[in-house]
C-alpha cells in the first residue's frame, strides 16, 4: 500500500484537474480568439482557458447577449437567463402565468387584493391565501396595527396582536402580562421525593437528591453501572454502593506491559446525576447519525478503492500520456451534462403538461356542476308543471268543463308535459311510462263521469307514475330531429336527496384504446319520488377526488426530487471513476482483467439500474398523463351529453308553451270556463315558461322574459275576441316543432336549422368509427384517440327557403341511388367507412387512416363566398355516388348537368362531384391502400353566366384492378377539370381544386391535387361550352387511347407515367410521389391564378390528339391543329400533349431507368385582348426516347411561346409560363423543372370586343401590330454525343431561355419557376422558381427585343456565343457548367448539386407587383457573359446599363448585379463548396421612372479559391439587391430578403435569411402618361434629382477576416447580410433566418432582427451562442 500512495495522489490530482476545468475547454492560442463580443480569453496553467465576458454578454464564448438586460417579464416576474443557450425565461409571481407573465389567474390575491396596508398576498391553494404583513401590521389581512412593536414580551414568550391589542403567551415557568415574573415551583410541596431538596431556577426547578437516589424527582435508586458509563468498549464493574470500575480495551501498538486498564469512579449525588444526563444526551444525539455515517463510510471506501485502482493502473502504465484521454474525458462529461439537461427539460415539460391538465379538469368540473344544477332545476319545474296539469284534468266541478274538445286539448298538453318529463328522465322506466300514458288516455275518455268514479279508478294507478320515468335519447326522438349520435344516459332519482350515478367501465379492445370510457345504464328506483334532483358524476377519476389525487401525487413526488438528485450526483461520480479505471486498464496490455472484472461488472450493473430507474420514472409520469387525458376525454363526452339533454328539454318545453298559449286564445271564447280556468291556464303557461328559463343558458333570459310578458298580456285579454288578441299577440319562435337538431357548441344558446355546427369524430386503430365527440371542446392531444376528424365547420349564413339535405351512407357495399334534386351550393364528401353528409354549408374535415384495411377521404371546405348572377334554367343537380370498396364495381355516376362541378377520385374508390371548392388532407400509410386528400379554401368567384350554360358533369366508370375501358364524358362542359390517379380513371371537375396525396408502398400509384385562392372574373358568351375530352386507357397493356377529337376552350392535359391523362379545362395543382422501381407518376400544382379574359366567338381551339405506347416507344400522333395558348410538357417515357393553360406539377422517379417531369405554375393574372385569327399553331413533336433521333421541331411562328426540354427527349414549345420539378437520382440522367406563379399581366390593346374590318386591321398593323408573333425556337439535340444544337435565329418578344446541364435550352417568352435535383458526379442541372409577379407595363412601339443565341458544349466547356442583341425584359439562367446570361426580371429557382465537382444555385422570387411606366427608347441591353468554369479566368462582365437586372451565380461563376429582390435555396453537400440561398416574397413596389434613369448594374470580378479583391460597384443603383455566398464578395442590397442555406460537411460556413410580407409603396409625382421635357426638367429641379441612393460597397477576405470597406454613401432602405466570416453592415428592417450544420467541427449562425435589435446566433461544437447589435433609427 505505501507504494501506491504517490500514484493515488497523481490520480486524485488528475481527477481534480478534469473536474475543475470547464467541460468544453478553450485554448487561447496565438492568432486564435475564441471569445466574441470583446470578450477576453484568460488562460489556465494547464493551457486551457475561459472567456471573460463584458457587461451585457454571457455564454461560454460571450456569444449570447444577456436576455435579461431588458426585463420583459411583467407583473413582477423574475427574468432567469440560461447562459449556455442565451435564452431567458420568466419566473412569474404567484397568480400570473404566460411566457411573459402577462396573464393573471382568477385568484382572490389578484381579484380582490385582500391584504391591506402593503401586505403581500401568497396563494396557498386555488381559493385560499395568506398575507405577509409589513412591519407594524398584523392580522389575517394585515388590517390591525402591530401592538407588539411597542410592548415586548419577556423571557422568550410569544406576542400576538388581536384587534390592535397585544397578548403575551408565556412559556412554562413564567407569568405576568409580559411574562416578566418567574413562577417559584418550589412553593408547591411534593416535587422532590425521598428527602430531595428543591432549588428554584428561572422558568424551572431542580431536585438535589440524597445519596442513593437519582432522577428528576429523586424517585429512582442509584445503580452505578445501570447506564453504561464506560466508553470505547470498556466494561463497567460495580465496586460499591455508589462506585464502579471500567475495564478498558488494550491500546494498539502500546509498548507498556499493561494489558488491562481499570478506572474506578466514585460518584456522589452531584457527579452521578450529571454523568447520567450527559450520557443520555450524547446517546440520543449520536444514534440518528449512525446509519448516515455508515453509508458515508461505505461510499468513501468505494470511492477510495476506485481511486486506488485508477492510481495503480496509472502507475503501472509508465508510457501512457494523460493528454490522450483528455478528449475521452471531455466527451464523457459532455454526455453526462447533456443527459442531465435533457432529463431536467423533460421533467419540466411533463410538469407543465400535468398543470395544464389540472386546470382543464377543474374547469370541466365546474361546468359539469353547473349543467347538473340546471338539469335538476328543470326536472323540478317539469314535475310541478305535470302536477298542475293533472289537477286540470280532474276538476272539482265537472259540469263547468268546456267539453270533449277542451279535454282533448288538455290531454294533449299533459302528453307534452309527460314527454318533457321523459326527456329529463332515465331510460329503464319506459314500461311505466306506457302504463301512465294508457291510464291518462282512459282519464280523457272518462272525464265527463262523476269525480267519485274517477277517484275509484285512480286508486289503481301507481303514485310515482307521473313523477318517475326514463327514456333513451336517440337521434330521431322528440320534436326536434337530430342527426347526431350520442350515448344513452341513465339517471336515477330518489326522494329529497341528490343521488345519481354515472357508472363508467372500460372497454377491452384489440387496439391501444383500452381506456375508452363507455357510459352504462344504472337501474333506477321504483319507490315514489316527490322531489327530484340529479347529479352526474364523471367517473372514478373525475371531480374533487381527481384534484385530491393530483395534489397527493405532487406532494409525494416533491420530497423525492432532492433525493434523486443526490443519487444522480453520486452515481455520476462513480460512473466517471469506473470509466476512467476501465480506460486505463484497457490501455495497459500487461494488466490482467480478471482481477477487476467483478468491479467493472458491478459498476455496469449500477449504471444499468440507474437507466432502468429513469425509464420507470418516465413510464410512471406517462401513465399519470394518460390518466388525465382519459379523464378529460370522459368529461368532454359527459358535457356533450348534458348539453344535448338540455337542448332537447328546452325544445320540448317550448313546444308545450306554444300549445298552452293556443289554449289561451280559443276560437270560441264564449265557451271558456271563465276567469278561473284562464288563470289556471295562465299559471300553467307561467310554469312552462319557467321551465324554459331553467333549461336555457343565461344569454336567453331576455327572450324568455319577452315570452313571459306576452303570456301575462294574453291572460288579461282572454275575454276579448280572438281577432283582437291576434292583433296584439307577439311573434313566437318559428322553430318550435320544426327546429333542426344540430350539434351544440360551447355556447348553449338556441339554434335554428341554418346555423353551422362543428362535429369532431374520433376513429381508433383497427376499428371503425368508435365514438363521436359532439361540440367544439378543448383541443387536447389524447394518445388513445388516433384520429380526430372535424367534419363540418362554416361561418357563412345559409340563404332562406333551403330544405335539409338527406344524409348519405357509404358503408353499404352495393350501389345506392343518390339525390337528383338541384343544389345551388352543394357539397359532397366521401368517407369510407364513416357516413357522408351533403350539406348546404361549407365545412372542414381531416381524416387519418393508419391501418391496412381502411380507406377514407376527408374534405375540408371553408369560408367561401359565391356571388352569382343567374339567368334562367341555371339549376344544377347534385352528383350521384356509387362505390364498392372491395369489389371494385362500376359506380353509378352523374347523368345531369352541374354548374361548377368538382370531382376528385382516390386510388381505390370513385369520388363524387361537389359543387364548391373544398379542402382536405388524407394520409394512407399502409401497403395495400391508396387514398386522396383535397385542400382548397378562400376562393371567391364572381361570375355572370348566360343562359343555357349548365355544363354536364362527367360520368365515371372504372374498375381498379381490371383497368377496363371507362365510359367518359360525351357532353359539353364549361371549365372542366380532370385529374387522374395512377390506378384508375379520373372524372372531370369544373373548378380548380387542391389536394395532397401520399402513397408509400410498392404496388400503388396515386395523385394529389392542390389549388387554392383562385379568383376568376369571366364573362362568357353563348355557345362557348367546350366539350370535355374522352379518355380510353388500360394501365398495363398500354393500348392506344381514344383521345379528344373535338374543340376545347382552354383545355388542359397532363399524363402520368403509367396511364393516359385526360384533358382538363382549368389550371390546377397536384403533388405526386412514387417510391418504387417500376412506376412513374406526375403531380401538378397551381394556385392563385386570376385571369381576366374576354373571348370572342368561334375561338375554341381544338385540343391535341395523343397517341402513345409506353414500352414500345413508337412515334406518337401529335398535334396538327392550331391552339390558342398551348402548353406542352413531356415526361421521361411518353409524349406530352399540349395544354391550353399554365399548370404546375412535381414528379419523383427514384430508379435508374425512369425520368419524369413536374410543372408548377400559380397566381397568374393575365388581361389580354385578342384579335381574330391569332390562334398560333401548336408545335409538332416527333421523338424516340432511346435512339435519340433528331426530332421534327417547330417551323411556325408562335405568340408567347414556351419551350422546356427534358434530359432524354425533345420538348415542344408551350405558349404560357409554367413550372415543374424534376428529380433524376441515378448516374446517367439529367432533368430539370420549372415553376412560375402569381404573374399578373395586364396588357392594353386597341379594341376588346367585336370584329374589325380588313381596313382597320391593316391600319392597326401599320401602327405597330406587324411582326409581333415571334417564331418559336427550333431545337436539335443528341444527348450522348453532346453536339451543338441549332438555336434561335429570330427575334422574340418576351423571350426566356433556361438550359439544363446536358442539353441546350430553348427560349421561352414568360418568367417561370423550376427546381432541379441532380445527385451524381457528372451531371449539372438548374432550377428556377418565380411566382406572384404583377407587372403593369405600357410598352411603346418598336420594343420587341431579340432573344439571345446560345451555343454550348457541356464537357469541353467551350466559350459560348452569347447575346449580341438588345432584349426587353429578358430572362436567362444557366447551370454551373455553362454560361449565365443576364436577366432583367426577378425569378426564383432551387438547385441541388450533391457531388464533389459541381456547384449550383437557386433563386426564388414571389409576389412582386411592379407598376412601371416605361418611356420610349428605354430598352436596356442585356449583359454579355463570357466564362470558363475550370480555368477560373476573369469573365467579361456587364458594360451596359440595365433596368431592373437580376442575376445570381453559383460557387464557380461570376455574380452579376441584381436590381430586384429575389429568393433562392441552394444545397452544397461536399467538402470544398459553399452555397447561398435567398427567399423574398410578397413585395409590392410602386415606382415611377423618368426617362434615362435605368441604373447601370455593378461589375463583379471574382476568383473563388484565391479570394482576390473584386471590383465592386462604382455607380448609383436604384433599389439594387445582391447577396454573396461565404466564398465571394457581397454587394449591397436595398430591400429585405430571405434565404435558407445548408452546409453539411466539415469545413464550410453558411447562413440563411427569411424575410416576407413586406409591402412598399412609393410615392411619385405622376403615375401614368407622358410628360413634356419642360415638366420633367421642372420636376428634377423640385427635388427629384439624385434620389437613387448608391448601394454600399463591401470588401472582405474570407479567412483573414479583415476590416471590410463599408458604406460611404447615403442609402434609402438598404439591406445587406454577409456570412459569418465577414463583417455585417447595418440593416433597417427585421428579418429572420435558420441555419443547420450537421458535423462536429462546423460553425453556423442564424440572424434575427426585430424592433431595432439584431441577434446573431452561432452554433459550434454542440454549443450555441448569440450576439446582438442595436441599430439606431
UniProtKB/Swiss-Prot annotation:
Residues 24-63, 64-102, 105-143, 144-180, 182-219, 221-258 form the EGF-like domain. InterPro entries: EGF-like_Ca-bd_dom, EGF-like_CS, EGF-like_dom, EGF-type_Asp/Asn_hydroxyl_site, EGF_Ca-bd_CS, NBPF, NOTCH1_EGF-like, Olduvai_dom. Residues 423-463, 713-734, 782-828, 1242-1280, 1561-1594 are annotated as: Disordered. Keywords: Calcium, Coiled coil, Cytoplasm, Disulfide bond, EGF-like domain, Repeat. Residues 1243-1261, 1562-1580 have a biased composition (Basic residues). It is found in: Cytoplasm. Its main location: cytoplasm. SUPFAM superfamilies: EGF/Laminin (SSF57196). Disulfide bonds join 28-41, 35-51, 53-62, 68-79, 73-90, 92-101, 109-121, 115-131, 133-142, 148-159, 153-168, 170-179, 186-198, 192-207, 209-218, 225-236, 230-246. GO terms for molecular function: calcium ion binding. GO terms for cellular component: cytoplasm. Residues 427-443, 792-801, 812-824 have a biased composition (Acidic residues). Residues 337-381 form a coiled coil. Belongs to the NBPF family. Encoded by one of the numerous copies of NBPF genes clustered in the p36, p12 and q21 region of the chromosome 1. This is NBPF family member NBPF26. It comes from Homo sapiens (Human).
Amino acid at each position: 500500500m505505501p507504494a501506491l500512495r504517490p500514484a493515488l495522489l497523481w490520480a486524485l490530482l488528475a481527477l481534480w484537474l478534469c473536474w475543475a476545468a470547464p467541460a468544453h475547454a478553450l485554448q487561447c492560442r496565438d492568432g486564435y480568439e475564441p471569445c466574441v463580443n470583446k470578450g477576453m480569453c484568460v488562460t489556465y496553467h494547464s493551457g486551457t482557458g475561459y472567456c471573460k465576458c463584458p457587461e451585457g454578454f454571457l455564454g461560454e464564448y460571450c456569444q449570447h447577449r444577456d436576455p435579461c438586460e431588458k426585463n420583459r417579464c411583467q407583473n413582477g416576474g423574475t427574468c432567469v437567463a440560461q447562459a449556455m443557450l442565451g435564452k431567458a425565461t420568466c419566473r412569474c409571481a404567484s397568480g400570473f402565468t404566460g411566457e411573459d407573465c402577462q396573464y393573471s389567474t382568477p385568484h382572490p390575491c389578484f381579484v380582490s387584493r385582500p391584504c391591506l396596508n402593503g401586505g403581500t398576498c401568497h396563494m396557498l391553494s386555488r381559493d385560499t391565501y395568506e398575507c405577509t404583513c409589513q412591519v407594524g401590521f398584523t392580522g389575517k389581512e394585515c388590517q390591525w396595527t402591530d401592538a407588539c412593536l411597542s410592548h415586548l414580551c419577556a423571557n422568550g414568550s410569544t406576542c400576538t396582536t388581536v384587534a390592535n391589542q397585544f397578548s403575551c403567551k408565556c412559556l412554562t415557568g413564567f407569568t405576568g402580562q409580559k411574562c416578566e415574573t418567574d413562577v417559584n415551583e418550589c412553593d408547591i410541596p411534593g416535587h422532590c421525593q425521598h428527602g430531595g431538596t428543591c432549588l428554584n431556577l428561572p422558568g424551572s426547578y431542580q431536585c438535589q437528591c440524597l445519596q442513593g437516589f437519582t432522577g428528576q424527582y429523586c424517585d429512582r435508586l442509584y445503580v452505578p453501572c445501570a447506564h453504561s458509563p464506560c466508553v470505547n468498549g470498556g466494561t463497567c464493574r460495580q465496586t460499591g454502593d455508589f462506585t464502579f470500575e471500567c475495564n478498558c480495551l488494550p491500546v494498539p501498538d502500546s509498548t507498556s506491559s499493561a494489558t488491562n486498564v481499570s478506572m474506578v469512579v466514585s460518584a456522589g449525588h452531584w457527579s452521578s446525576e450529571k454523568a447520567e444526563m450527559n450520557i443520555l444526551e450524547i446517546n440520543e444525539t449520536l444514534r440518528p447519525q449512525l446509519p448516515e455515517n455508515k453509508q458515508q463510510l461505505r461510499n468513501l471506501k468505494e470511492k477510495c478503492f476506485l481511486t486506488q485502482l485508477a492510481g495503480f493502473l496509472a502507475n503501472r502504465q509508465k508510457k501512457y500520456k494523460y493528454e490522450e484521454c483528455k478528449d475521452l474525458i471531455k466527451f464523457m462529461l459532455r454526455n453526462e451534462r447533456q443527459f442531465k439537461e435533457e432529463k431536467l427539460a423533460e421533467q419540466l415539460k411533463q410538469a407543465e403538461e400535468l398543470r395544464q391538465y389540472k386546470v382543464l379538469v377543474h374547469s370541466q368540473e365546474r361546468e359539469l356542476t353547473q349543467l347538473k344544477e340546471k338539469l335538476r332545476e328543470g326536472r323540478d319545474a317539469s314535475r310541478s308543471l305535470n302536477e298542475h296539469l293533472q289537477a286540470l284534468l280532474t276538476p272539482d266541478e265537472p259540469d263547468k268543463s268546456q267539453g270533449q274538445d277542451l279535454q282533448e286539448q288538455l290531454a294533449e298538453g299533459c302528453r307534452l308535459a309527460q314527454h318533457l318529463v321523459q326527456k329529463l328522465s332515465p331510460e329503464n322506466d319506459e314500461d311505466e311510462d306506457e302504463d301512465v300514458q294508457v291510464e291518462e288516455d282512459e282519464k280523457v275518455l272518462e272525464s265527463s263521469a262523476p269525480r267519485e268514479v274517477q277517484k275509484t279508478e285512480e286508486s289503481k294507478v301507481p303514485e310515482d307514475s307521473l313523477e318517475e320515468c326514463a327514456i333513451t335519447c336517440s337521434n330521431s326522438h322528440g320534436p326536434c330531429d337530430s342527426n347526431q349520435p350520442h350515448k344513452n344516459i341513465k339517471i336515477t332519482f330518489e326522494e329529497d336527496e341528490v343521488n345519481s350515478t354515472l357508472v363508467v367501465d372500460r372497454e377491452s379492445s384489440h387496439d391501444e384504446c383500452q381506456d375508452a370510457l363507455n357510459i352504462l345504464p344504472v337501474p333506477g328506483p321504483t319507490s315514489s319520488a316527490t322531489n327530484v334532483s340529479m347529479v352526474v358524476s364523471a367517473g372514478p377519476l373525475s371531480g374533487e377526488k381527481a384534484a385530491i389525487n393530483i395534489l397527493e401525487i405532487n406532494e409525494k413526488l416533491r420530497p423525492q426530487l432532492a433525493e434523486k438528485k443526490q443519487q444522480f450526483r453520486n452515481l455520476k461520480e462513480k460512473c466517471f471513476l469506473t470509466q476512467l479505471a476501465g480506460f486505463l486498464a484497457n490501455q495497459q496490455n500487461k494488466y490482467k482483467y480478471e482481477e477487476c472484472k467483478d468491479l467493472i461488472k458491478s459498476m455496469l450493473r449500477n449504471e444499468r439500474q440507474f437507466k432502468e430507474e429513469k425509464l420507470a420514472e418516465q413510464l410512471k409520469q406517462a401513465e399519470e398523463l394518460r390518466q388525465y387525458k382519459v379523464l378529460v376525454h370522459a368529461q368532454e363526452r359527459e358535457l356533450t351529453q348534458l348539453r344535448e339533454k338540455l337542448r332537447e328539454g328546452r325544445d320540448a318545453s317550448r313546444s308545450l308553451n306554444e300549445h298552452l298559449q293556443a289554449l289561451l286564445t280559443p276560437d270560441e271564447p264564449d265557451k271558456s270556463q271563465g276567469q278561473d280556468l284562464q288563470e289556471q291556464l295562465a299559471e300553467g303557461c307561467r310554469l312552462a315558461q319557467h321551465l324554459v328559463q331553467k333549461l336555457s343558458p343565461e344569454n336567453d333570459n331576455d327572450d324568455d322574459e319577452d315570452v313571459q310578458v306576452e303570456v301575462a298580456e294574453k291572460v288579461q285579454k282572454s275575454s276579448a275576441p280572438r281577432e283582437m288578441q291576434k292583433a296584439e299577440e307577439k311573434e313566437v319562435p318559428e322553430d318550435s316543432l320544426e327546429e333542426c337538431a344540430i350539434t351544440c357548441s360551447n355556447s348553449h344558446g338556441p339554434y335554428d336549422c341554418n346555423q353551422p355546427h362543428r362535429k369532431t369524430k374520433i376513429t381508433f386503430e383497427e376499428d371503425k368509427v368508435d365514438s363521436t365527440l359532439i361540440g367544439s371542446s378543448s383541443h387536447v392531444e389524447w394518445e388513445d384517440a388516433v384520429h380526430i376528424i372535424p367534419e363540418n365547420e362554416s361561418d357563412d349564413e345559409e340563404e332562406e327557403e333551403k330544405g335539409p339535405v338527406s344524409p348519405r351512407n357509404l358503408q353499404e357495399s352495393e350501389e345506392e341511388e343518390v339525390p337528383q334534386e338541384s343544389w345551388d351550393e352543394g357539397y359532397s364528401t366521401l368517407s369510407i367507412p364513416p357516413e357522408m353528409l351533403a350539406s348546404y354549408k361549407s365545412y372542414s374535415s381531416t381524416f387519418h387512416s393508419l391501418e391496412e384495411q381502411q380507406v377514407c377521404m376527408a374534405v375540408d371546405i371553408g369560408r367561401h363566398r359565391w356571388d352569382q348572377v343567374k339567368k334562367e334554367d341555371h339549376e344544377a343537380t347534385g352528383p350521384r355516388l356509387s362505390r364498392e370498396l372491395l369489389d371494385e364495381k362500376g359506380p353509378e355516376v352523374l347523368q345531369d348537368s352541374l354548374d361548377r362541378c368538382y370531382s376528385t377520385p382516390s386510388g381505390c374508390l370513385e369520388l363524387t362531384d361537389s359543387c364548391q371548392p373544398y379542402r382536405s388532407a388524407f394520409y394512407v400509410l399502409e401497403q395495400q391502400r391508396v387514398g386522396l386528400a383535397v385542400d382548397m379554401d378562400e376562393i371567391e368567384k364572381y361570375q355572370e353566366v348566360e343562359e343555357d350554360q349548365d355544363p354536364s358533369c362527367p360520368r365515371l366508370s372504372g374498375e381498379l384492378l381490371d383497368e377496363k375501358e371507362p365510359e367518359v364524358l360525351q357532353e359539353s362542359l364549361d371549365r372542366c377539370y380532370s385529374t387522374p390517379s395512377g390506378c384508375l380513371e379520373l372524372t372531370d371537375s369544373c373548378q380548380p381544386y387542391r389536394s395532397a396525396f401520399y402513397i408509400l408502398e410498392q404496388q400503388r400509384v396515386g395523385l394529389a391535387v392542390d389549388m387554392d385562392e383562385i379568383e376568376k372574373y369571366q364573362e362568357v358568351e353563348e355557345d362557348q361550352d367546350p366539350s370535355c375530352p374522352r379518355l380510353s386507357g388500360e394501365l398495363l397493356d398500354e393500348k392506344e387511347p381514344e383521345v379528344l377529337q373535338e374543340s376545347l376552350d382552354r383545355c388542359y392535359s397532363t399524363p402520368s407515367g403509367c396511364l393516359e391523362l385526360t384533358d382538363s379545362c382549368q389550371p390546377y395543382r397536384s403533388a405526386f410521389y412514387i417510391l418504387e422501381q417500376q412506376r412513374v407518376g406526375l403531380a401538378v400544382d397551381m394556385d392563385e391564378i386570376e385571369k381576366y379574359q374576354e373571348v370572342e366567338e368561334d375561338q375554341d381551339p381544338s385540343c391535341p390528339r395523343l397517341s402513345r405506347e409506353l414500352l414500345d416507344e413508337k412515334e406518337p400522333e401529335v398535334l396538327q391543329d392550331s391552339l390558342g395558348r398551348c402548353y406542352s410538357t413531356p415526361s421521361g417515357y411518353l409524349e406530352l400533349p399540349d395544354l391550353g393553360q399554365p399548370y404546375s406539377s412535381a414528379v419523383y422517379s427514384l430508379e435508374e431507368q425512369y425520368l419524369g417531369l413536374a410543372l408548377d405554375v400559380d397566381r397568374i393574372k393575365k388581361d389580354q385582348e385578342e384579335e381574330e385569327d391569332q390562334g398560333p399553331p401548336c408545335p409538332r413533336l416527333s421523338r424516340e426516347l432511346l435512339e435519340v433521333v433528331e426530332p421534327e421541331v417547330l417551323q411556325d411562328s408562335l405568340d408567347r411561346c414556351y419551350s422546356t426540354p427534358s434530359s432524354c427527349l425533345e420538348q415542344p414549345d408551350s405558349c404560357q409560363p409554367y413550372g415543374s420539378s424534376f428529380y433524376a437520382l441515378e448516374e446517367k440522367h439529367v432533368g430539370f423543372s420549372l415553376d412560375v406563379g402569381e404573374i399578373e399581366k395586364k396588357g392594353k390593346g386597341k379594341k376588346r370586343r367585336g370584329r374589325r374590318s380588313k381596313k382597320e386591321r391593316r391600319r392597326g398593323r401599320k401602327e405597330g401590330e406587324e411582326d409581333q408573333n415571334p417564331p418559336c425556337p427550333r431545337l436539335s439535340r443528341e444527348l450522348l454525343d453532346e453536339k451543338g444544337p441549332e438555336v434561335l435565329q429570330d427575334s422574340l418578344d418576351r423571350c426566356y431561355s433556361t438550359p439544363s446541364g446536358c442539353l441546350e435550352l430553348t427560349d421561352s417568352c414568360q418568367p417561370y419557376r423550376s427546381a432541379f435535383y441532380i445527385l451524381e458526379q457528372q451531371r449539372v442541372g438548374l432550377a428556377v422558381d418565380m411566382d406572384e409577379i404583377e407587372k403593369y407595363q405600357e410598352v411603346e412601339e418598336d420594343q420587341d427585343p431579340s432573344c439571345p443565341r446560345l451555343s454550348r458544349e457541356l464537357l469541353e466547356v467551350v466559350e459560348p456565343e452569347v447575346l449580341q442583341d438588345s432584349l426587353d425584359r429578358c430572362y436567362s439562367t444557366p447551370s454551373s457548367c455553362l454560361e449565365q446570361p443576364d436577366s432583367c426580371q426577378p425569378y426564383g429557382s432551387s438547385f441541388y448539386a450533391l457531388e464533389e465537382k459541381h456547384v449550383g444555385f437557386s433563386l426564388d422570387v414571389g409576389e412582386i407587383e411592379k407598376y412601371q411606366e416605361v418611356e420610349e427608347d428605354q430598352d436596356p441591353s442585356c449583359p454579355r457573359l463570357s466564362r470558363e468554369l475550370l480555368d477560373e479566368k476573369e469573365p467579361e462582365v456587364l458594360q451596359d446599363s440595365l433596368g431592373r437586372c437580376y442575376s445570381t451565380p453559383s460557387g464557380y461563376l461570376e455574380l452579376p448585379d441584381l436590381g430586384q429582390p429575389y429568393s433562392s435555396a441552394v444545397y452544397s453537400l461536399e467538402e470544398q463548396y459553399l452555397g447561398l440561398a435567398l427567399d423574398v416574397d410578397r413585395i409590392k413596389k410602386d415606382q415611377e421612372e423618368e426617362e434615362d434613369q435605368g441604373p447601370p448594374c455593378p461589375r463583379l470580378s471574382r476568383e473563388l479559391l484565391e479570394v482576390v479583391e473584386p471590383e465592386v460597384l462604382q455607380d448609383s443603383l436604384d433599389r439594387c439587391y445582391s447577396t454573396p455566398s461565404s466564398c465571394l464578395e457581397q454587394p449591397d442590397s436595398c430591400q429585405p430578403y430571405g434565404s435558407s442555406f445548408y452546409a453539411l460537411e466539415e469545413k464550410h460556413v453558411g447562413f440563411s435569411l427569411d424575410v416576407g410580407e413586406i409591402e412598399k409603396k412609393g410615392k411619385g409625382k405622376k403615375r401614368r402618361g407622358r410628360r413634356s421635357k419642360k415638366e420633367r426638367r421642372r420636376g428634377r429641379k423640385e427635388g427629384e434629382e439624385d434620389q437613387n441612393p448608391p448601394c454600399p460597397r463591401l470588401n472582405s477576405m474570407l479567412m483573414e477576416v479583415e476590416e471590410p470597406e463599408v458604406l460611404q454613401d447615403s442609402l434609402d432602405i438598404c439591406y445587406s447580410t454577409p456570412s459569418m466570416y465577414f463583417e455585417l453592415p447595418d440593416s433597417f428592417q427585421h428579418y429572420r433566418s435558420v441555419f443547420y450544420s450537421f458535423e462536429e467541427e462546423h460553425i453556423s449562425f442564424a440572424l434575427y432582427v426585430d424592433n431595432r435589435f439584431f441577434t446573431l446566433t452561432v452554433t459550434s461544437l454542440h454549443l450555441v451562442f448569440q450576439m446582438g447589435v442595436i441599430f439606431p433609427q
